[in-house]
Amino acid sequence: AGIMITASHNPAKYNGFKAYGPDGCQMTDDAAAIVYDQIQKTDVLTGAKYISFAEGVAKGLIQFVGEDCKEALYEATEARQVRPGLCKTAGLKLVYSPLNGTGLVPVTRVLSDIGITDITIVPEQEYPNGYFTTCSYPNPEIYEALEKGLELAKKVGADLMLATDPDADRVGIAMKCPDGSYELVSGNEMGVLLLDYICAGRIEKGTMPKNPVAVKSIVSTPLADLVAKYYGVELRHTLTGFKWIGDQIAQLEANGEEERFIFGFEESYGYLAGSYVRDKDAVVGSMLICEMAAYYRSIGSSIKQRLEEIYAQYGRFLNQVDSYEFAGLSGMDKMAGIMNTLR
């Protein structure tokens, strides 16, 4: 079990922690309730113990992740390529922003490993800054978080602009159109595009497992159901929250069938293509988005053109996501009241 200290894709004032179980998946409700109950029993003035970071290291209570672990993660991520080697000759030109978060090293390392080296980083958003001074809401779902990246993409003529949120589990993109403008791709659109690309590519390469499984949240586009059915993939539906997608992987693993899992996504820009981790992963998402762009470019097509072909085949699905903020403890109570009324 462990925690990740992060504000995620939210404003800095929401800095807190995500709790993970021993399988690397965010805790589901029953386990989280046990942790929350213990927190409620702790007196914040007398019950919480404190030592300095340096003392924690000296006592062996804090240990740094070794290079062997990092290399294993990179290897597992790069193993999820659908068409290995394709990107080395694609000549893809990319602008990337880690939005002052943690994505810079892992994203650029993996992209470089698979052959994408023409990467321009948004300079103001290159290095970690927990105050998010360049955009107060570092969520790649919203236009404001992508503004600096889009400006730079237009300046250098990039084929794609990618942005990962500060804890690098969500990735947003803008694609270059024939007229030189840039069009944002929604999480629903990208989820369907990646599902289609992975299915078609793995069938072509003979790497599709028997009885493949994909997973999406119930609030994500039903277009994915049609795509999955076309390719003979079982598509499972979960409640909102990637922990439930991770839980589906755990259920497959319990039966020795985790290799059946090929892809999971949520409309909120979260993607995962493998069982090596149990949370949405912007590193593998960025890699597959770039590979997909390189592939369509190599056959004289584009991400935009493939999306239109998908709509022509299955029908056009329009989606709109509205976000509402309920601040503080009173906001949590208000949200709970709204949900109870809906139920």
Residue ranges and their predicted role:
Residues A1-D43, N139-A163, A168, V192-I198, ...:
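Phosphate/diphosphate-binding loops
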Residues K13-A19, Q40, V105-V110, Y131-C135, ...:
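Short acidic, glycine/serine/threonine-rich loops at helix termini
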Residues N15-A153:
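Gly/Ser/Thr-enriched, mixed-charge loops and adjacent short helices
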Residues Q26, D30-I34, D68-A72, G101-P106, ...:
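Conserved active-site and cofactor/substrate-binding residues in soluble primary-metabolism enzymes
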Residues T6, N10-A12, G47-I51, I121-E126, ...:
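Core alpha/beta catalytic barrel or barrel-like domain that forms the active/cofactor pocket
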Residues K154, A158-L160, S181-E183, G201-R343:
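Phosphate-binding and adjacent anionic-ligand microenvironments
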Residues A7-N10, L94, P98-V110, P166, ...:
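Conserved phosphate/anionic-ligand binding catalytic regions in large, soluble enzymes, centered on
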Residues M27-T28, C177-I203:
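Cysteine protease catalytic core and zymogen-processing segment of caspase-like enzymes
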